[in-house]
Amino acid sequence: MAGVSDAAAPGSGGEGRRGGGGSPEQLQQDGCRGEPKTLWGSSELRPPPAGPGQPSPHQRTETLGFYESDRGRKKKRGLSDLSLLRFISAELTRGYFLEHNEAKYTERRERVYTCMRIPKELEKLMFFGIFLCLDAFLYIFTLLPLRVFLAMFRFITLPCYGLRDRRLLQPAQVCDILKGVILVICYFMMHYVDYSMMYHLIRGQSVIKLYIIYNMLEVADRLFSSFGQDILDALYWTATEPKERKRAHIGVIPHFFMAVLYVFLHAILIMVQATTLNVAFNSHNKSLLTIMMSNNFVEIKGSVFKKFEKNNLFQMSNSDIKERFTNYVLLLIVCLRNMEQFSWNPDHLWVLFPDVCMVVASEIAVDIVKHAFITKFNDITADVYSEYRASLAFDLVSSRQKNAYTDYSDSVSRRMGFIPLPLAVLLMRVVTSSIKVQGVLAYVCVVLFYCGLISLKVLNSIVLLGKSCQYVKEAKMEEKLFNPVPSASAGKPAGKPQSMFKSTHGFSTDENGSTSVTNQPVHQKDSPPSLLVTSNSDQFLTTPDGEEKDISQDSSELKHRSSKKDLLEIDRFTICGNRID
């Protein structure tokens, strides 16, 4: 009986075995019913003894384990139901702190501000450059005829005063006469080109063929411009080279015929461009004009994703200035031809006005987008356009000095690739064929119009010179204009009178101190290498911001350069449209 009572006593027997001393199979079954699997037999995990009036530890553990297990199931079920809501709430209330990456976001903001400044700075450069091209273009029609007349008058009246000088004419006067003769010869040669036949020949072609022709003409125009100024410079130097030099050229006459042929072919090329644009204007559905304008946006693809330095961007900016001014002249030619066909009816001008605005607007939009993304991808600031404008202003100011080494129109041609002679020949041909001058009153109007052009040229030159001085002063480049003139070469004998002295830029001046616009360079064979002087404006451009301190090192390295390397550099600068110094 004692054994039975002992087995039935609470806390012992079956319950005791269930609570802690059961077999492993019973423990496993209890664990499946949600009871804890902890083995209370271990001394470390044995529960504390139960107090009076409390259930045994094993019973309490079982009861609590059951309710805790049931509550855990409900909690897990609630978590599984609310997981999507909690994720959405976490996404809606999640925060972050931008100030931890302040430098990155500041740089991005500056890029946005730079892109916003690009249109203003670019158009300021374009505006200044277009007026520079206009000044060089008006020079052909206004001051060049007067200078040619003065040079011819000097040549005719020279025997009356005696031959006091070795030269019959000054180098600048020789160049002016050559320009005038080339202009007149090419003008008469253009009369043999039938504009009407060319118009109908182009109009009969398909749209795709005209699109291809227009692209080829743009490429040919750039090639002609890059090589044409070299032909003209070779002619000017051959005609004014000192006679005591060893003859190393083919002669003035072959160079002259090459220059005439170049100006004539380039004028025909521009005429074909103007004719193609005229056909696009007169097309019924304007599809050709739209395709031609969309061709400008191809420039964005070809330019934006390339590596650009400051010098490359300057060359492209000059090319854009020249291209925009040339397009303005082409639009003027198209309007003149259309107004002539409609008997100068002013109502037809308003028909052409939307197309003209579309061409101009597309050109401006393409330039802005192209320059904005080029500066963004290459980390170029918008202040670089002020440097470009100051460099162009330096060219203008230096050409007005007494020791100027070239004419300003030639300087613009070398810097921007804009050659005004072919464009002037074509405009003269179109104007004279479109406007008939008959009667005394008509000639009076022509004289008044010529006086107006001279007034416009003088006013434009004065304003440009004033603004150029301001830009040069703001860029702190005025000290480069007042370099001391080096002494004569040391390799010449002292007893021989020297009639030529080396000027600041390596060009010559006369003995009496009078200098001309196109003073000729002195032969560099006898002069020491240290007297080689580069152009100040080119040095300003080709020197990046952080390399101004290395100019002295570059000048020391210049002494060790060979003449062959210098010639290669001159050819490279010539192809790129830079100035030849």
Swiss-Prot record:
Region (Disordered): 1-72, 484-563
Ubl conjugation keyword on record: no
Compositionally skewed regions (Polar residues) per UniProt: 500-522, 532-542
Residues annotated as transmembrane: 125-145, 182-202, 250-270, 417-437, 439-459
GO biological process: cartilage development; cell projection organization; neural crest cell development; ossification; positive regulation of bone development; positive regulation of cartilage development; positive regulation of cilium assembly
Pfam families, per the entry: DUF747
Cellular component aspect of the GO annotation: centrosome; ciliary basal body; cytoplasm; membrane
Biased amino acid composition, Basic and acidic residues: 549-563
Domain of life of the organism encoding this protein: Eukaryota
Record field: compositional bias (Gly residues): 11-23
Protein family according to the UniProt entry: Belongs to the TAPT1 family.
Role, per record: Plays a role in primary cilia formation. May act as a downstream effector of HOXC8 during development. May be involved in cartilage and bone development. May play a role in the differentiation of cranial neural crest cells.
Protein name: Transmembrane anterior posterior transformation protein 1 homolog
UniProt lineage: Eukaryota, Metazoa, Chordata, Craniata, Vertebrata
